[in-house]
Amino acid sequence: MSTNQILHCETAKRLLDEFGHAIQAVLLLHEQQFQSIVEGDSDAGRFDLLIHEALELKQNAKYAYLNHLDSHNCSY
């Protein structure tokens, strides 16, 4: 395996890790919103914008990873 391929795989790993962290952030916000609703918080909707932004970050991370795999023919 060439040095270039190793770097691509390291990049793929980093991008996959970023995608995983973005997914975890969305799940955490959903969990916090659910807990807020269960506790009777009348302002549970305050999570909606945060969730929307987290979902955008997740999508960006997902496509950064997929585009990298496609353009460099590597995998992780």
Describe the predicted segments one by one.
Residues 2-24:
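Short, charge/polar-rich alpha-helical segments
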Residues 4, 38-43, 65-76:
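Long amphipathic alpha-helical coiled-coil segments
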Residues 26, 50-74:
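Amphipathic alpha-helical coiled-coil segments
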Residues 25-34:
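A short, structured beta-strand/loop element
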Residues 13-16, 43-56:
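Short, charged, amphipathic alpha-helical segments
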Residues 2, 34, 41, 45-49:
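General secondary-structure edge motif
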